[in-house]
């Protein structure tokens, strides 16, 4: 009985340690409904560009390598982001190997994600796969994302925020990090889940969210620790 209670206590402590909440909520983040224009109306030239980019995305699926990347990028998780950018930085980003970088990314990305909630709920834009009634490359998300607004792209907020934050941690790898972050957003067009304008807007939302993060002293401390850890790991 005593052993069971000890194990239970350890489990509860582990769960408490891994549970993370955003540093700021959606109402504390910049409001994209106020600083960005609405998504393009279907009667505009901008929407015709969205349609053209949707066709471009379908063409990209013919490249098996690019298709595989887009499918992998469709997995929304901070651990997947860590895996993606581990290859770019040349170090294993994980809770065990790089705890400071992992914690910075976890709290940072959970917070920047908040910036997409207000505009998504406000516009509730129809996603391209729903608009065209066509399948995506990642069917498991199709059902629930039908009721989730398309503008701006939440995945792109995640991927571009990560790229910006890691550029601060590893400025020597800035170009490669940002190129991968850009590719991550384009994967959403290829997947059929987002219009190009959703992705473009999301990069601006992510940039605004990261700027807001830097006004929070708790986060600036996390960035400093992450940078110090990276400099030790790359030696």
Protein language model regions, located:
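Alpha-helical transmembrane segments and their juxtamembrane interfaces
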Residues: 12-13, 165, 208
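Boundary at the C-terminal end of the N-terminal hydrophobic targeting segment
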Residues: 17-19
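C-terminal domain-closing interface element
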Residues: 202-224
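Sec-dependent N-terminal signal peptides
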Residues: 4-13
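Histidine-centered divalent metal-coordination motifs
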Residues: 155, 194, 202
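Hydrophobic alpha-helical bundle signature of multipass membrane enzymes
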Residues: 21-191, 212-215, 222, 231-235
